[in-house]
Amino acid sequence: SQAALAVNISAARGLQDVLRTNLGPKGTMKMLVSGAGDIKLTKDGNVLLHEMQIQHPTASLIAKVATAQDDITGDGXTSNVLIIGELLKQADLYISEGLHPRII
């Protein structure tokens, strides 16, 4: 349904928004605080994706794809999340104009 599609795209875009500011040499650091109060500063997308407690199935699947990319090549976790988010953003625009999701 249209509502389910919107929720899935929104979850993917939320993950994209979290990682967007990490990309590149001027990327910002994120502070992770564990349940025990330990603090970790990082801008490594792979570390962030491993440490985040992602609940939504679509966002979790995207995180798994990105971390698999990083495990294989040693890089690219953040870029993968950003590209997937942009592809879904564009797909959402086409769908809102009446294009059927199967065509995309």
UniProtKB/Swiss-Prot annotation:
A GO cellular-component term linked to this record: chaperonin-containing T-complex
Class of the enzyme per the UniProt entry, highest EC level: hydrolase
Species in which this protein is naturally found: Sus scrofa
Catalytic activity: ATP + H2O = ADP + phosphate + H(+)
Family annotation (PROSITE patterns): TCP1_1, TCP1_2, TCP1_3
Function noted in UniProt: Component of the chaperonin-containing T-complex (TRiC), a molecular chaperone complex that assists the folding of actin, tubulin and other proteins upon ATP hydrolysis. The TRiC complex mediates the folding of WRAP53/TCAB1, thereby regulating telomere maintenance.
UniProt key word Ribosomal protein: no
Subunit structure, as described in the record: Component of the chaperonin-containing T-complex (TRiC), a hexadecamer composed of two identical back-to-back stacked rings enclosing a protein folding chamber. Each ring is made up of eight different subunits: TCP1/CCT1, CCT2, CCT3, CCT4, CCT5, CCT6A/CCT6, CCT7, CCT8. Interacts with PACRG.
One Pfam family it belongs to: Cpn60_TCP1
Record bears the keyword ATP-binding: yes
Residues engaged in binding ATP: G24, G76, T78
Family: Belongs to the TCP-1 chaperonin family.
Binding site for Mg(2+): D75
Predominant localisation class: cytoplasm
EC numbers: 3.6.1.-
InterPro entries: Chaperone_TCP-1, Chaperonin_TCP-1_CS, Cpn60/GroEL/TCP-1, GROEL-like_equatorial_sf
Binding site for ADP: G24, G76, T78, S79
Alphabetically ordered keywords of this record: ATP-binding, Chaperone, Cytoplasm, Hydrolase, Magnesium, Metal-binding, Nucleotide-binding
GO-annotated molecular function: ATP binding; ATP hydrolysis activity; ATP-dependent protein folding chaperone; unfolded protein binding
Name of the featured protein: T-complex protein 1 subunit zeta
Subcellular location per the Swiss-Prot or TrEMBL entry: Cytoplasm
